[in-house]
């Protein structure tokens, strides 16, 4: 069967996903799906006249199960996700007045991520024991940019990048 989901909310929040499940035979089945999420944001950066906390996120997943023999099961999963997010709606705090200013800074603070996860679960059922193996791989590439003085002045900012590949 197929599942389709669509939702909407305040502040331009939208989500949609579709997943299809299919049993091809007694020995093979799979599912495949994807999603998209959008949020326009709630907090405004007064200096840039843009919403700070927007979200664009999309991804997909494939899972397949194969039973080549009565004793052997192979379960493969592949997931991908991309995120593009704004963040950090902070305003400067004034001790003398006890008030926090509206967020207003010169650099847009963002987070971008590409993430791939794959795994292969292998299970062999012998007469007196079960042998299980899980093999996985993850690829992560992301970038964080942040205005750290939280003002219209160009004093402090950070950019952090990472790229990781993990095999287990």
Language model regions located:
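Membrane-spanning beta-strand positions in outer-membrane beta-barrel proteins
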Residues: 1, 29-31, 71-77, 123, ...
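N-terminal/domain-start segments enriched in small and hydrophobic, helix-friendly residues
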Residues: 1-5, 63-67, 124
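Extracellular loop and loop/strand-boundary signature of outer-membrane beta-barrel proteins
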Residues: 3-6, 44-50, 103-108, 117, ...
């Amino acid at each position: 069967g197929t599942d389709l989901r669509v939702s909407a909310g305040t502040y331009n929040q939208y989500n949609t996903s579709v997943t299809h499940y299919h049993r091809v035979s007694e020995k093979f089945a799979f599912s495949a799906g994807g999603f998209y999420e959008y949020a326009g944001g709630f907090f405004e950066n007064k200096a840039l006249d843009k919403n700070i906390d927007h979200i664009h996120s999309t991804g997909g997943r494939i899972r397949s199960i194969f039973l080549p023999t009565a004793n052997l099961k192979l379960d493969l999963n592949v997931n991908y996700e991309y995120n593009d997010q704004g963040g950090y709606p902070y305003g400067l705090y004034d001790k003398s007045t006890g008030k926090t200013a509206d967020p207003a800074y010169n650099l847009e603070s963002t987070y971008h991520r590409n993430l791939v996860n794959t795994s292969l679960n292998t299970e062999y059922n012998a007469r007196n024991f079960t042998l299980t193996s899980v093999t996985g791989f993850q690829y992560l590439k992301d970038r964080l940019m942040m205005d750290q003085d939280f003002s219209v002045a160009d004093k402090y900012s950070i950019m952090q990048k990472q790229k990781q590949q993990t095999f287990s």
